[in-house]
Design a protein with these regions (language model features):
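Electrostatic, structured charged patches in enzyme active sites and in nucleic-acid/phosphate-binding
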Residues: 1-147
Length: 147
């Protein structure tokens, strides 16, 4: 996923950020690009990065874990309605089930586990969003205009 360079983001418009502006962590260049978009976009009223958690059951160990969605954003729509979104930034490849292979390599098994864990997180997030009248979006390199 993008370059896996962890960095801190300092917003140009800190009043839009909901949380501690000194602790905005970007775990990839793609997340950094999304932070910049949130910060600079006039339609974004407020945004937060990893500021809350959603419990989910991991298929990896069948235990309850905490999932911290990448972003929570409030957007002023064209009709002047305010809409809230939970946003996860992920490579498109991780949003699709791994293609079956004849050899079950370590890499393939890791892809399978990653996909299963993501699906569990996103199922819990969709349920959370339905309960709170929020929309869930997974943003990939396609939406970010990368590649």
């Amino acid at each position: 996923m993008g370059e896996s360079i962890k960095s801190k983001y300092t917003p140009i418009y800190p009043s839009k950020y909901q949380g501690n502006t000194k602790h905005i962590i970007c775990r990839s260049s793609w997340e950094r690009k999304f932070c910049q978009w949130c910060d600079m976009n006039n339609s974004i009223i407020s945004w937060a990065s990893e500021e809350f958690s959603i419990p989910y059951v991991s298929p990896k160990d069948n235990r309850v874990n905490k999932y911290y969605p990448d972003y929570l954003i409030k957007v002023k729509e064209k009709n002047d309605m305010i809409k809230t979104y939970v946003v996860e930034v992920k490579p498109y490849k991780q949003t699709m089930p791994p293609k079956p292979r004849s050899r079950k390599t370590k890499s393939y098994l890791t892809e399978c586990v990653t996909y299963a864990v993501n699906q569990a997180k996103w199922k819990a997030t969709k349920e959370f969003c339905e309960d709170h009248r929020i929309e869930f979006k997974v943003v990939t390199e396609k939406e970010l205009g990368i590649r």
